[in-house]
Amino acid sequence: MALWLTLVIALTCFGGLASPGPVPPHSTALKELIEELVNITQNQKTPLCNGSMVWSVNLTTSMQYCAALESLINISDCSAIQKTQRMLSALCSHKPPSEQVPGKHIRDTKIEVAQFVKDLLKHLRMIFRHG
């Protein structure tokens, strides 16, 4: 009987350790951004944003959301990416104020918005998978 009780208590304790915890809000926002980018890339019948060009940015920095937003913010009259811009803005504002100020980016390459969105999607999926 004592052994059975010990086993039940041990399983209860280990069960609590193995149960998933709450999903952080950042992960939810990241997942929603990924879903939005998937929708944008899948529904392309015409060139995204009329083939507009944006600066290529280094998405591996700690300011990746702010850098992506900074690159896309200059695109006007493109309703397809407005929601993406708002989502990036929300993710960028999660940074401490000292990190929000964009550093000097090396701006030597412009790419089409469609390619930028595909690259951003690939990068964000990697972040989501690997935490």
UniProtKB/Swiss-Prot annotation:
Q: Which residues cross the membrane?
A: none
Record's signal peptide: 1-18
- PROSITE patterns in the record: INTERLEUKIN_4_13 (PS00838)
Q: Which Gene3D superfamilies match?
A: 1.20.1250.10
Task: Show the InterPro entries listed in the entry.
Answer: 4_helix_cytokine-like_core (IPR009079), IL-13 (IPR020470), IL-4/IL-13 (IPR001325), IL-4/IL-13_CS (IPR018096)
Question: Where is it found, in Gene Ontology cellular component terms?
Answer: cytoplasm; external side of plasma membrane; extracellular space
Cystine pairs annotated here are C49-C78, C66-C92
| Family under the similarity heading | Belongs to the IL-4/IL-13 family.
- Task performed by this protein: Cytokine that plays important roles in allergic inflammation and immune response to parasite infection. Synergizes with IL2 in regulating interferon-gamma synthesis. Stimulates B-cell proliferation, and activation of eosinophils, basophils, and mast cells. Plays an important role in controlling IL33 activity by modulating the production of transmembrane and soluble forms of interleukin-1 receptor-like 1/IL1RL1.
Subunit-level organization: Interacts with IL13RA2.
What protein does this entry describe? Interleukin-13
Q: Which gene encodes it?
A: IL13
